[in-house]
Amino acid sequence: MQTTTTYIALLSALSFSAAAQQVSIQAPQSATANDFIEVFKQLSGEHPGVRKGHAKGVCALGSFEPSATAQARFDTPLFSEQAPITLRFSMGGGNPNADEAANAPRGMAVMFDLDNNRQHKIAGLTTPMFAGKNPEQFLGLLRINYAIAQGEATGADRKAYLEANPEAARQGEWLQSHQPAAEYTSANYFGIHTFYTT
């Protein structure tokens, strides 16, 4: 009787353990800023006072002078006159000590200081696509990567996730055939926003 009870208890524990370690191949239903902060901390550790995403970066100051063509075509303060700008070039991920030789996306953010205390901000990546069609897919990919780092998932789990969420695979596929630029200033940056003109 004792052997049977122990055997049933052991099977129950194994069944519970397998269920607890099962990795979802579906993107989460929602993604909040706090979700990303948490997963970046899990993946890269605690770095007080440092941004959680694109943690390693360098800033620069400059000025933006719109072309005569832009001034003639667009009726917007951004193209009306010269403006001081602040730029930040960065490495993707949450590690402030990231290896700049890594084949990873780089970012560029630009803040335009316009008249009347107005600002305009744009951002770009060195990849023509993002790691997911929406925040949920990207968050799911980061969570799979963390589970793999913890030994709770495998490369097969990531492959299944990417098959279920093919948009999350495209950036990694693109990076495999494109080496990073030697310098931030010699890279091509792709806008992460779409602008329509009339």
PLM feature spans:
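Active-site-adjacent core segments of small-molecule enzymes
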Residues: Q21-T198
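Gram-negative bacterial Sec-dependent N-terminal signal peptides
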Residues: M1-A20
